[in-house]
Amino acid sequence: MTSKQRAYLRGLANHLENILHVGKGGVSAMVCKQADDALTARELIQGRVLPTAPESVRTVAETIAASVNAEVVQVIGRVFVLYRRHPEEPKIILPRER
């Protein structure tokens, strides 16, 4: 993913709600399943890591992204953004490389 595409996705993520919350249980199979379902439906999701989580925000985002075959777009504070293109019907069209 290019920096231009990443910047485009960050702009789209500004208006998203946090639909994924990771708490003291850390990254579990249920959290990964929720992320997978949300990415299939939306392609771009925003999540929050609560202060009680045992891992860092970057670690949580990378772990979830690896388990659901997504990309980490951004990590700011306790919030992270993940993107995975829908295989059949993409809703988000990324800008091309020039």
Residue ranges and their predicted role:
Residues 1-98:
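Positively charged, polar, low-complexity stretches
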